[in-house]
Amino acid sequence: MPIPFADGMLSRLGRRGAALDLIEEFEDESGEPPASLSPADLLAAEPALLLQKMENRLVRHHLANPDVLSGEQLRKLRYILNFARLADFEPGAAGPGGSRGRGDISVGGQVAPWRSRGVDALYAPLREEPDPVTALEGAKDVLATLVDDQDDQRRVLIERHGSDFSATELDAEVGYKKLVTVLGGGGGAGFVYIGGMQRLLAAGQVPDYMIGSSFGSIIGSLVARELPVPIDEYAEWAKTVSYRAILGPERRRSRHGLAGKFTLRFDQFAHTLLSRADGERMRMSDLAIPFDVVVAGVRRQPYAALPSRFRHRERSTLTLRSLPFLPIGIGPWVAARMWQVAAFIDLRVVKPIVISADGATRDVNVVDAASFSSAIPGVLHPETSDPRMLPILDELCADQDVAAMVDGGAASNVPVELAWERVRDGRLGTRNACYLAFDCFHPHWDPRHLWLVPITQAVQLQMVRNLPYADHLVRFEPTLSPVNLAPSAAAIDRACRWGRDSVEPAIAVTSALLEPTWWEGDRPPAAEPKERTKSAASSMSAVMAAIQAPTGRFRRWRSRHLT
């Protein structure tokens, strides 16, 4: 939404024009297709994305006009679109009984001619036609011309790859989608995600893969730790957060972050929550739901040019920031630093780094990954307290050629594009997914938080790149204040209610996209849900028992207002 005076404020700071120029520059450098590309160019650049958008529109039109297509016609149109998306996939990975380990098979070259024909035939009704009913009727007419040839295409592919996959495994790849949930940053505004997850889980939609940035990485790490997800217990756990528990005076020395007013002590507060039953800290590979964390790596050249207050932690004592007790609040010093955070939201300054359970980062502690992803430059500064992590983080910074790690939102606050690329590159084995994005940090007009305007505006420029990859974007509203990192119990309850209400309209869309499709017979490919592996996480009863709530009136006041 437009924000009064925001444009004038940004132009006075000389930032608005530069930011818009950067968006054009980043799109040119990325090689990703802008929305203005022709169908042929978009198909050549990213055919799977074009077909994803066509299926999305088909499903939305059908939800609004359910009497135009029969259930069978909708199912077969969706099957054709998803069959045309086939390229690389891992046989056996798709569907509720999917398993990994067989490696990828490539069929993209064989499917390419059929892909081109399908796109040419369905592009007009599913991308160009503005009237939903006319679009559905046009798609129905096209279906009649494609059915016989689709049957031949499917049969030939199965015959050619009889030793690679079965007909059931092919139909599972085409017919079943994984639910990918993207959790964006936004500080205390992100507590609404707990309610959003409550509604999602109540609908039976458990994420198959998640990726989180900034505060979204904290909520994501909770949801991913064990199955079934004890989301109501997480809401109760959130009510125990206090400023004194999560913030402290800045450390004088650090190896992997920037200087800031506060040390982020999330690793201490969430130690039991994100530890295994044997007492060891949970690693990315221990999570029950595949989960990736986005952090922003500060490039070495921009890092060297930063003001010394960002780089030299030892100067903390000179500004009295090492005192053991600090008042909580957005005073002039913190507000001034927050204005400067917008300068980090620039891909020339930072680069996205994905910490995942595959590859070299599989042994990174979950709590450390979430802490670095939430490290607001110049304000919140984390550092691992686990000696085992030091060489791992050293190697990560060296491999990525970065000097420090900061808030993942600086690189990608709602990282839908990264999630899409991770799935395309084989994160789940299957490449067929529904992408649901959560965004709690979008522009609001609030005279109390004018200092947030440059940040929210810069983050919204990132959405130009990310939005095309989402099947549905939930913009949570209302939310708690982004600066309210330790809400009261009543505020958590409100945030959960707002979160449930915000996600409600998305359920119909995700339910329709997750509905399986098939080509032959009267039901989807038979698949038995795989047996759930035992969670490595500590029990929630042990987590809640380990929390020591302050007793006494003064201690409760100090916990809420002092570090």
What is the meaning of each model-derived region?
Residues 2-4, 107, 378, 399, ...:
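C-terminal helical/tail subdomains of lipid-metabolizing enzymes
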Residues 292-421:
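Active-site gating loop/helix substructures
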Residues 1-176, 534-560:
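N-terminal low-complexity/intrinsically disordered extensions
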Residues 167-174, 282-285, 396:
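Short boundary motifs at domain starts and secondary-structure transition points
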Residues 147-210, 563:
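Helix-rich "cap/lid" substructures immediately adjacent to catalytic or cofactor-binding pockets
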Residues 187-276, 303-325, 508, 512:
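Patatin-like phospholipase
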Residues 186, 196, 216, 293, ...:
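Conserved small-residue
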Residues 275-291:
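A short alpha-helix-loop-beta-strand transition element characteristic
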